[in-house]
């Protein structure tokens, strides 16, 4: 069993990563139905929450069938992060997560997300401000460092643990890599092997198959795995990994009917959540994802 504060997860839990414009309630619900053990919301701007921005507030929507679930916040100001943690607390998630890993320029330029990777002292202050502002368990998601020449995840892990965080998810790339190249889990393994590290360490990056998930578990010794892009349009990946781990066998690929049903449920739940017009418009971007790598046959014309 893996513990995050008062949250109990199964051995080697599978986490759904927070993804902007992806990890909304309808998609999270699909992933939960298909084996995700812990999920996170899309990241939410601390400044947006304080301004009571509609988009930011809407991202606070969570539902009991999703639990355990964490709400992820980002920002570069200590006071704003503390205030946003208190706002998050009002909707009663299971935990609060801090984003120190988003590499997108518009976030980094605000001194948030991966923008703080060059200033560990600031990371510590921001984290401490959140930990001290909430009774909920606080976790962090980050990257190896700013670039190859400034990998500092070992220092970051120890210092953030000292602030009181309850778990750390590490993406195996630097900010400079964005999502290019390959993730390097050797640094994640080194953090996990550090005798001073007592909190759960979750690995993230390039897990796209049951074989790779189990290979990385055995090779790098992480407590669990966080899955992001590989779950887009394929929420079945969680149960596929679990089945392979338990039996050594592969589950069959989802049928056309199962893919259609997933896309249909995504649409229906989006409409229930945001209304018919918005639900339809926002779900359109997801339809094709459910049919990637799938050949669709039509009857030949007479």
Regions found by a protein language model. Give the residues of each.
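Glycine-rich, positively charged N-terminal anion/phosphate-binding segment
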Residues: 1-5, 10, 19-94
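Conserved small/polar residues in nucleotide/adenosyl-binding loops
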Residues: 297-302
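Glycine-rich beta-to-alpha transition loops that act as phosphate-gripper elements at the mouths
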Residues: 20-21, 74, 142-147, 200-211, ...
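Hydrophobic faces of well-ordered beta-strands that scaffold small-molecule active sites
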Residues: 14-17, 39-41, 69-73, 96, ...
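C-terminal helical cap(s) of enzyme catalytic domains, especially alpha/beta-barrels
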Residues: 234-250
């Amino acid at each position: 069993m893996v513990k995050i504060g008062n949250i109990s997860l199964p051995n080697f839990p599978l986490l759904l990563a927070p993804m902007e414009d992806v990890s909304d309630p309808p998609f999270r619900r699909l992933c939960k139905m298909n084996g995700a053990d812990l999920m996170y919301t899309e990241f939410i701007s601390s400044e947006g929450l304080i301004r009571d921005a509609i988009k930011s507030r809407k991202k606070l929507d969570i539902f009991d069938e999703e639990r355990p679930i964490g709400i992820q916040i980002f920002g570069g100001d200590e006071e704003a992060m503390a205030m946003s943690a208190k706002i998050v607390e009002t909707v009663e998630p299971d935990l609060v997560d801090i984003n120190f890993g988003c590499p997108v320029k518009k976030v980094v330029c605000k001194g948030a997300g991966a923008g703080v990777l060059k200033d560990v002292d600031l990371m510590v202050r921001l984290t401490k401000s959140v930990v001290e502002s909430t009774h909920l368990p606080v976790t962090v998601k980050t990257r190896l460092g700013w670039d190859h020449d400034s990998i500092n995840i070992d220092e970051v892990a120890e210092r953030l643990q000292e602030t009181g965080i309850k778990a750390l998810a590490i993406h195996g790339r630097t900010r400079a890599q964005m999502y290019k190249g390959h993730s390097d889990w050797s640094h994640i393994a080194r953090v996990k092997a550090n005798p001073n590290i007592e909190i759960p360490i979750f690995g993230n990056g390039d897990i796209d198959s049951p074989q790779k998930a189990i290979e990385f578990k055995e090779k790098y010794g992480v407590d669990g795995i966080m899955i992001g892009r590989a779950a887009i349009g394929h929420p079945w990946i969680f149960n596929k990994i679990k089945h392979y781990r338990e039996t050594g066998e592969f589950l069959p690929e989802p049928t056309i009917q199962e893919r259609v049903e997933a896309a249909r449920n995504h649409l229906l739940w989006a409409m229930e959540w945001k209304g018919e017009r918005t639900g339809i418009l926002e779900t359109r971007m997801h339809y094709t994802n459910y049919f990637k790598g799938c050949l669709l046959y039509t009857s030949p014309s007479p």
